[in-house]
Amino acid sequence: MKSFYNITYRYFRAPWDIGARDELVLLVETGRIKPSRAIDLGCGTGANAIYLAQNGFDVTGVDYAEAAIEKARSRANEANVTVNFIVDDLTNLRHVSGTFDFLLDYGVLDDLRLHQREPYLRNMLPLTHAGSQFLLWGFEYPMRWWEKFVPFYDIPFQPGEIEQRFGSYFEIEKIAGRIDYSKWPPGYATYLMTRKGEATK
């Protein structure tokens, strides 16, 4: 998958590279997410990270695709903003330290195989503190029976999966989503979470 993303970012315009995402913009504009120390988990070419920097956030962006980080740094320079872009693996972080007030994941966790999602959580939790907010977007819909036989088709979140994985650590609010099998993707969901009590790893 890493080679796929590097080739896509280096030679093409990724179809998901569509600028700052609507839910993020709305949360910032309405003040639900306030300028703070933020990290974009799987930042791609940096659209969301750059938007946050333009709105007063102290931003770190992380992606394991070197080609994406190269483009992100160039775009931040063109936008005349400062973002700390880092090449790192979200299932085995080595170059990110400290905690963040706001964490953002648009389409990374749902792109991980099922066996990679627990390592993601173990690496993400130490980046939070009590009160940290986490915005998570991903494909979410009940898999149809035949999809279980399609290779690499364990991508979508299953209903209840986010609550099961994150509920012990976060208060969870589902702020957007739909399921419609006549469209692609058949379903998606956006969650805004707040880290509970005293943060524990």
Q: What are the language-model segments listed below?
A:
Residues 1-39, 45-95, 112-123, 127, ...:
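Class I (Rossmann-like) S-adenosyl-L-methionine-dependent methyltransferase catalytic domain
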Residues 95-103:
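A short acidic, Gly/Pro-enriched loop at the edge of an enzyme's catalytic core
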Residues 107-111:
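Short catalytic micro-motifs in class I SAM-dependent methyltransferases
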